Regions:
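Divalent metal-coordination and catalytic microenvironments
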Residues: 18, 29, 59, 71, ...
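Conserved beta-strand hairpin/beta-sheet module of binuclear metal-dependent hydrolase folds
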Residues: 1-48, 141-152
């Protein structure tokens, strides 16, 4: 599995693109807020010929979901996350005002609910969703046993 890390937005947060030899990929936490960040993510995916199969969120705090509408528009992907965090989507506009800015795009609803133990497959790679409530009630980490790595 190959990994590309981006650091996005004013908070900042990490976004990961994971892919394997099949060029199937997942994007984790697309926190791209600024237009140049969105273009950097899109350009990387396009230039590497990646076929993004899943958009995964570790949790749904504001800084981790900025790019979800962009991913839906550009790649037709709805986010996958734990249902216990879904309320954060409705809170996003209010949260952004608390931090002194407006969202550029309205948050989009989740496409799939992930649960503890769910397996996400892309190409020949498998990630296990592990529910780790604490930072947020629906926090998930994604573990790749074959490569001994975890994304949180």
């Amino acid at each position: 599995m190959k990994i590309k890390r981006f650091e996005f937005n004013m908070f900042p947060e990490n976004c990961y693109v994971l892919w394997d030899e099949t060029n199937e990929a997942v994007v984790i936490d697309p926190g791209c807020f600024y237009e140049e960040e969105k273009q950097a993510l899109k350009n990387f995916i396009t230039k590497n010929g990646l076929n993004v199969k899943h958009l995964l969120n570790t949790h749904l705090h504001l800084d981790h979901i900025f790019g979800n509408p962009f991913m839906l528009k550009e790649f037709g992907l709805k986010a996958e996350a734990n249902q216990a965090d879904e309320f954060w989507i409705d809170e996003a506009p209010k949260q952004s005002r608390m931090f002194g800015f407006q969202l550029q795009e309205a948050p989009v609803p989740l496409g799939t609910y992930l649960h503890d133990g769910d397996i996400i497959t892309f190409g020949n790679t498998k990630l296990e969703a592990i529910h780790v409530p604490g930072h947020s009630p629906g926090s998930l980490v994604y573990y790749c046993a074959a490569d001994h790595c975890m994304f949180s």
